[in-house]
């Protein structure tokens, strides 16, 4: 039977960073008249995200056996991710998005035991133009019109909502609540900022396997555990 062993840090933790800043400005106006309480307002939301993810950034070696490892034979496979710059220092992609919203709702006390709430929210998310176009990718998928710096277009989200509160017995011992509506959340920021970091413009990954001759560079004294040493051996 085969035995599989891993030694060292996992391939996904090195270089991880997640930093998000959110600023929200809200202004509401409420007006009560008769059985109605009307609320209207506007909201501005800013989200900025910095992300670091270098899968296999600390180097990854796969050997056919323990004997191959201790005898310094060439590995079966190797991978490393590094920055696309001369000093190979990790870069942390950043992206910022904004969203503009307006909304209005009415709380109508139709009966002392029954309240109906209904409203409408309009949201316009705006995404920036990314500076991460991979020219080779653009040329390869020119027919489809795909580019690594594409972001979602600014579409208006229309979200109607309605809900009710029913005091069945009139003594608040049995209350039935319900509602429905359209609720649009934000796109996960990590998806957007990863488009910057993983487009092969900020960082790149080298993967060697099979009969790739460069694997022989890691035979003998070619095996290293420090990242500068690994990159020096590779390049």
Predicted regions and their residues:
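Membrane-embedded beta-strand positions in outer-membrane beta-barrel channels/transporters
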Residues: 24-26, 101-107, 117, 159-161, ...
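Residue-level signature of outer-membrane beta-barrel architecture
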Residues: 30-33, 44, 104, 108-110, ...
């Amino acid at each position: 039977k085969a035995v599989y062993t891993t030694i060292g840090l996992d391939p996904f933790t090195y270089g991880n960073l997640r930093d998000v800043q959110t600023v929200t400005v809200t202004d509401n106006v409420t007006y009560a008249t008769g059985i109605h309480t009307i609320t209207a307002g506007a909201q501005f939301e800013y989200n900025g995200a910095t992300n670091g993810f270098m899968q296999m950034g600390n180097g990854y070696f796969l050997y056919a056996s323990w004997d191959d490892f201790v005898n310094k034979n060439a590995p079966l496979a190797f991978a490393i991710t590094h920055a696309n710059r001369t000093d190979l220092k990790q870069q942390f992609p950043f992206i910022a998005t904004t969203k503009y919203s307006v909304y209005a709702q009415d709380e109508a006390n139709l009966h002392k035991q029954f309240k109906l709430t209904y409203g409408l929210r309009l949201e316009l998310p705006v995404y920036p133009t990314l500076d991460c176009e991979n020219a080779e990718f653009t040329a390869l998928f020119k027919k489809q019109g795909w580019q690594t710096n594409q972001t979602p277009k600014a579409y208006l989200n229309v979200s109607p909502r309605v809900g009710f509160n029913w005091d069945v017995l009139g003594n608040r011992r049995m209350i039935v609540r319900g509602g429905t509506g359209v609720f649009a959340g934000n796109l996960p920021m990590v998806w957007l900022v990863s488009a910057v970091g993983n487009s092969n413009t900020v960082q790149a990954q080298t993967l060697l396997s099979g009969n790739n001759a460069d694997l022989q560079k890691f035979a003998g004294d070619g095996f290293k555990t420090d990242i500068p040493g690994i990159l020096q051996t590779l390049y």
